Amino acid sequence: MNDTLPTILVVDDEIDTCRNLQDILADLGYRVDVAHDGPSALELVRHKHYDVALLDYLMPGMDGLTLYREIKKLSAGTVAIVVTAYAGGTTTEEAQKAGAWQVLPKPVDFPKLMGLVDEALGQPLVLVVDDDPDLCANMWDLLRDRGYRVAVAHDEREATAQLANEALRVVLIDMKLPTGDGAKVYRLVRRVNPKARAVVITGHRSEMEEKVRQILAEGADAVCYKPFDVPNLLDTLARLSGERNGDGAEGAR
């Protein structure tokens, strides 16, 4: 089986719905796993990355929104599409607050759902490597609102586990991490996923000046300083996410 194929998780307590979605998505070339409840879905997510999760809103025990909040803790880059017989009104608002990308009514319009899956997979994937959970949460909200998929890592170990994802377009790397350092993570990016673009970030401009200069000389694409100039950060990400490495690096400040 081709491990580079997009992976989809379908979670619904209706067995026939799961079977139909699994058959359709598999025929389209996706790798598909199925779970019929929240705990089973979380067990799958603990051992495997999913690009998109299709989640039933109402299920016995853990509902789809509670499930997605837990999925985000394990796999922030997974995009959620919620399906429900109660679409609209407060359901849509609650889903958006939980971070779900789209809400679809049941019975499912399969062509529309397939279009949304394709659209979700086309969103550039950005990995934020920073030990500050509040910054990561804010970046997740900011970038998701602008159409990026956003994965998160808080240290070198967590980053290393995600760097091999071939969908990865840009990695934002904090220069100070609790284990390892940003320079080491940058070099891992170049070794493990050389097509990904790399932006170093730091709130310690003077202290990190020499290290930043060295990393830029090694080929990092840009540096952004904290507190972020948000328009500049977004412009940098927009430029880099549309490129693949090999087009020439530019240090943007």
Segments from the language model and where they lie:
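Two-component/phosphorelay signaling modules centered on CheY-like receiver
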Residues: I15-D33, P133-A151
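The short loop immediately C-terminal to the conserved phospho-acceptor aspartate in CheY-like receiver
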Residues: E14, D51, Y57-L58, L65, ...
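Acidic catalytic/metal-coordinating carboxylates
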Residues: D37-S40, D63-T66, D155, D181-K184
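The feature encodes the CheY-like receiver
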Residues: C18, P60, G88, P178
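Active-site residues of response regulator receiver
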Residues: D56, T84, D174
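Acidic, metal-coordinating helix/loop segments flanking the phosphotransfer/catalytic sites
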Residues: V34-V52, K73, V152-V170
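Alpha4 helix (beta4-alpha4-beta5 surface) of REC/receiver domains from two-component response regulators
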Residues: T66, K73, A87-Q102, K184, ...
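Hydrophobic/aromatic residues positioned on beta-strands within the core alpha/beta folds
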Residues: V83, I201-G203
